[in-house]
Amino acid sequence: MAKPSFINLLNAYPKVQSPCDQPWGNQCAIRMSIALNGELNIKVNKSTYTDPKCKHEHARGAESLANWLWRHHLGRPTILSGSAADRQTISQKTGIVFFKDCFARGNEEESQRSGDHIDLWNRGRTMGYYDGDYMSRQVWFWELA
């Protein structure tokens, strides 16, 4: 299967923060699903993606979407620590980025954080959340041209 085109993903990426009308507070996986579906090389829907979805058949979880991309479509990502030094290795690249355990949810202590984020990475910038405090336990990166 062909890898998605970064520019096509960028063009298909939703312009709104919460594209789903359901009450999901964190919609990064939904936004990435919409971009993937719009790009056309990788489809996220009920016949291809079995993890939890919103009513529109978009992925709801960042980690489950990242694992699905790894297992079924893009192969093993470059896996980095959350450090600033490691991020420099991808700073001038484009692709899909997954931040593992980058923020605390609800009543979690920061040391027990489990919040994840998936996004487009455009030469050091994302479309939404950015882990500027380098809190991620891991950063996964799939380079796309």
Regions found by a protein language model. Name each.
Residues 51-127:
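...with weaker cross-activation on analogous glycine-rich loops/strands in unrelated enzymes
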Residues 46, 111, 133-135:
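General "foldedness" signal
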Residues 1-55:
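N-terminal capping segments
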Residues 35, 99-102, 144:
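Active-site-proximal beta-strand/loop segments in catalytic clefts of secreted hydrolases
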Residues 20, 64-66, 136-138:
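Acidic, low-complexity intrinsically disordered regions
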